């Protein structure tokens, strides 16, 4: 392990603070009462004022501190001057105390690609299903997701008025994942988490092929991976295009750092080069344990229907 004064660990420490700031913005927009909803491509593909402000905050804060990064965000925004109030320039000191895995110690700023989803679970956000919402900042090197930060702005929001709202989970491959308590679904139980708002026949047929004991239909890719690492679900199964690289980059790191696995429906690892296509065209299959069991149950007809 190398000193934490490396580009990667400084970037992760910054991303942690920046994700917290974005989470505050997400909460503030709800509190102010005007979500500013616009449809991007259809009624289930929405953008709100929180998406726009959070992305401005994240991308501008990262670009100021790390000007040579490649930053790819979900929302297309005009290159307007960003209000100073949206900029976060602090770093989470606890991360800077951690050693950098030696394989990443010499990484340069310009070698890294950051994938940003400023508000994962937008549809659920507009419907008041606030525990589905996450802020995702994923960091990739040579096409591989190697570090990630997930902020849950409304973690604890149903725990009463005195509860502390929000939490931030982070991880680096070779170091671990932090900010949560790792749990597993009881042995022999097959609980599937899948999409709430983007279902179709391929999705439902693939879920059924898993012979599940229960199916959880929730919003947000980040939220589904958190269900895996906290023992609420055994597998995340989404046999459809629809989810993008900014949805999976950060969550994949957290899952991989604790021994899980995330691939497309064919078992291919996802690539995060700056020039890669944004859509995960062949869906997502992710588990904390027993990946091979779930992968073996994906019907050939579904694989044939989904081209990587």
UniProtKB/Swiss-Prot annotation:
CDD domains noted in UniProt: IPPase (cd01640)
UniProt cross-references to PANTHER family, sorted A to Z: 3'(2'),5'-BISPHOSPHATE NUCLEOTIDASE 1
Top-level taxonomy: Eukaryota, Metazoa, Chordata, Craniata, Vertebrata
Residue numbers bearing the N-acetylalanine modification: 2
Positions where Phosphoserine occurs in the chain: 240
Annotated cofactor note: Binds 3 Mg(2+) ions per subunit.
Cofactor(s) the record lists: Mg(2+)
Single biological process term from Gene Ontology: nervous system development
Tissue-level expression: Highly expressed in kidney, liver, pancreas and heart. Detected at lower levels in brain, placenta, lung and skeletal muscle.
Name the record gives this protein: 3'(2'),5'-bisphosphate nucleotidase 1
Residues engaged in binding Mg(2+) 1: 74, 117, 119
Family named by the database record: Belongs to the inositol monophosphatase superfamily.
Annotated binding of Mg(2+) 2, by residue: 117, 120, 247
Native organism: Homo sapiens (Human)
Modified residues (Phosphothreonine): 122
Residues annotated for AMP binding in this entry: 195, 198, 220, 224
UniProt modified residues of type N6-succinyllysine: 244
Molecular function GO labels: 3'(2'),5'-bisphosphate nucleotidase activity; inositol-1,4-bisphosphate 1-phosphatase activity; metal ion binding
Function as written in the Swiss-Prot or TrEMBL entry: Phosphatase that converts 3'(2')-phosphoadenosine 5'-phosphate (PAP) to AMP and inositol 1,4-bisphosphate (Ins(1,4)P2) to inositol 4-phosphate. Is also able to hydrolyze adenosine 3'-phosphate 5'-phosphosulfate (PAPS) to adenosine 5'-phosphosulfate (APS). Probably prevents the toxic accumulation of PAP, a compound which inhibits a variety of proteins, including PAPS-utilizing enzymes such as sulfotransferases, and RNA processing enzymes. Could also play a role in inositol recycling and phosphoinositide metabolism. Is not active on 3'-AMP, inositol-1-phosphate and inositol-1,4,5-triphosphate.
Entry binding sites for Mg(2+) 3: 74
């Amino acid at each position: 392990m190398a000193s934490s004064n490396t580009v990667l660990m400084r970037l992760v420490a910054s991303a942690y603070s920046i994700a917290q700031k974005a989470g505050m913005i997400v909460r503030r927009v709800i509190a102010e009462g005007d979500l500013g909803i616009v449809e991007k491509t259809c009624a289930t593909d929405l953008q709100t004022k929180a998406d726009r402000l959070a992305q401005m905050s994240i991308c501008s804060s990262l670009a100021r501190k790390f000007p040579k990064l490649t930053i790819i965000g979900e929302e297309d925004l005009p290159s307007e001057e960003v209000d100073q109030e949206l900029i976060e320039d602090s770093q989470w000191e606890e991360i800077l105390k951690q050693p950098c895995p030696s394989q990443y110690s010499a990484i340069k700023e310009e070698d890294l690609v950051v994938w940003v989803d400023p508000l994962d679970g937008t549809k659920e956000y507009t419907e008041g299903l606030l525990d589905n919402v996450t802020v995702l900042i994923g960091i990739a090197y040579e096409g591989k997701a190697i570090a990630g930060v997930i902020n849950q702005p409304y973690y604890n929001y149903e725990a009463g008025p005195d509860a502390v709202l929000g939490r931030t989970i982070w991880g680096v491959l070779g170091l671990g994942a932090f900010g949560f308590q790792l749990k597993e679904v009881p042995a022999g139980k097959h609980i599937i988490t899948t999409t709430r708002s983007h279902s179709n026949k391929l999705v439902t047929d693939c879920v059924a092929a898993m012979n599940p004991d229960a199916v959880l239909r929730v919003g947000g890719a980040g939220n589904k991976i958190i269900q895996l690492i906290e023992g609420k679900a055994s597998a995340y199964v989404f046999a459809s295009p629809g989810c993008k690289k900014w949805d999976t980059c950060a969550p994949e790191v957290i899952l991989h750092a604790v021994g899980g696995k995330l691939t497309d429906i064919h078992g291919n690892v996802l690539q995060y080069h700056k020039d890669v296509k944004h859509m995960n065209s062949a869906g997502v299959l992710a588990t904390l344990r027993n990946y091979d069991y779930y992968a073996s149950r994906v019907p050939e007809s579904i694989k044939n229907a989904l081209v990587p």
